[in-house]
């Protein structure tokens, strides 16, 4: 029998057979012979002037409000950023009768390259390809303006969002021409996701830097095996590839592990082969999809000196520039001096920006170790949880 522990959080990871967790009733030490990490992802935070104004939502927050609470973000809306999720949420908001004025993406969506690539999506996965066409038709039928090769460069308002400025972009260069200005009440902005892989980092799994997002991915083979023995990783906690790849890789891992306890049957081998084919197909789908949504790399380019970079502790870009000096040349040193990254999110959002500013100041390369080091507890945890006697779980 499989024991399911709901609402249980892992706050410490010291070894694959030494994980610490808790829920409302118990404290646990988990000692696993095989560990599968599937901790998902979080949205990237690209700082933009006055992005702390009420009315500025992440795309994921807008989707959660709509799907979980049947509540659309209010008033006149613009969906902006980069990636297919933004197209999806724009269509979902329109179906919910929301007033979406424009869908803005930093990719050049209507390039000649994309005209040839788009039909490939339908060939690789007809179901997902048709779903994407449906989203696009929803925008066209509602006469929502589609603006490509553009980014939000400023949010404007007194105590709440009133306007958004949209500028053209190419090769990380923001156009100096007069930006488009929209009168809005809400903005959903999203520039993709970063893997939530703190457990894998603490366990010493090999990492690979994503040079576009400056987020680390967990190195793994085709079936999700990491560099650490008996540690596996699936889903967006490994790299951002979507639900279908998580599903099929999870199936491959399950079959692999079951084969260690019993002799594999013909049906197991057939199921493994089918899952491997589907995984390969969806990996190809993602590769083509992100070629279509390929956009200039953005980290701190949309912020000015007064922009808040660390939202948890209200640290501005100017504060960071002031303290990045000849003897403060690492993310850890900046963290200790400015407290950026010491808030509840533990640097998940500001770490890439701190790395970028250090790199620009010193001309130093960014690698897998440039960001903030993972710490225990992984996320804010009550001290009573850490001090309370533990109930051991062997799994």
Task: Mark where each language-model region is.
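Residues forming the flavin
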Residues: 1-344, 348-395
């Amino acid at each position: 029998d499989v024991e399911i522990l709901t609402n249980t959080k892992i706050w410490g990871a010291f070894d694959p057979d030494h994980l610490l967790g808790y829920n409302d009733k118990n404290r646990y030490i988990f000692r696993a012979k095989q560990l599968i990490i599937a901790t998902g992802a979080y949205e990237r935070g690209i700082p933009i002037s006055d992005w702390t104004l009420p009315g500025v939502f992440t795309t994921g927050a807008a989707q959660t409000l709509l799907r979980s609470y049947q509540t659309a973000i209010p008033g006149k809306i613009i969906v902006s950023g980069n990636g297919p999720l933004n197209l999806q949420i724009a269509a979902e908001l329109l179906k919910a009768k929301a007033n979406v004025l424009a869908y803005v993406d930093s990719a050049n969506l209507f390039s000649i390259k994309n005209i040839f690539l788009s039909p490939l999506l339908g060939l690789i996965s007809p179901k997902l390809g048709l779903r994407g066409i449906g989203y696009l038709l929803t925008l066209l039928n509602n006469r929502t303006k589609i603006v490509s090769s553009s980014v939000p460069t400023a949010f404007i308002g007194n105590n709440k969002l009133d306007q958004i400025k949209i500028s053209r972009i190419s090769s990380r260069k923001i156009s100096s021409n007069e930006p488009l200005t929209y009168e809005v009440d809400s903005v959903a902005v999203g520039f993709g996701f970063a893997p939530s892989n703190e457990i894998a980092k603490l366990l010493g799994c090999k990492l690979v830097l994503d040079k576009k997002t400056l987020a680390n991915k967990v190195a793994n083979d085709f079936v999700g095996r990491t560099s650490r023995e008996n540690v596996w990783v699936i889903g967006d906690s490994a790299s951002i590839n979507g639900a279908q790849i998580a599903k099929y890789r999870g199936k491959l891992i399950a079959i692999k592990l079951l084969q260690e306890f019993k002799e594999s049957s013909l049906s197991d081998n057939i199921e493994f082969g089918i899952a491997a084919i589907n995984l390969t197909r969806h990996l190809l789908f993602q590769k083509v999809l992100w070629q279509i949504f390929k956009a200039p790399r953005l980290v701190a380019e949309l912020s000015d000196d007064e922009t808040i970079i660390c939202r948890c502790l209200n640290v501005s870009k100017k504060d960071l520039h002031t303290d990045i000096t000849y003897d403060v040349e690492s993310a850890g040193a900046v963290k200790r001096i400015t407290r950026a990254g010491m808030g509840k999110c533990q640097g998940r959002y500001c770490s890439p920006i701190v790395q970028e500013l250090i790199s620009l100041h010193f001309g130093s390369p960014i690698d897998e170790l440039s960001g903030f080091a993972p710490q225990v507890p992984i996320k804010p945890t009550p001290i009573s949880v850490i001090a309370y006697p533990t109930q051991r779980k062997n799994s």
